[in-house]
Amino acid sequence: MNSYDIKVLIEASIEDAVVNVSSDDNVHFEAIVISQGFQEKSLVQRHQMVYDSLGDKMQSEIHALSLNTLTPKENLE
């Protein structure tokens, strides 16, 4: 699992998502996910949407994932 694989999974699952994923070791990842689909969602709900897109990979291939989830408007602020 690498940053690109995670990006593809998130973009495929969350409509209109713009995703940037980085990692120094392909085990610990940091993701910025921007989506209009996060509108009116709590932080927990947003993170759950991302975790759901990664499925069982969160239990096996991804040791840690730091998330920053934003709507397009929040990203401009």
Which residues are covered by each model-predicted region?
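N-terminal, polar/charged subdomain of small-to-medium soluble alpha/beta proteins
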Residues: 1-77
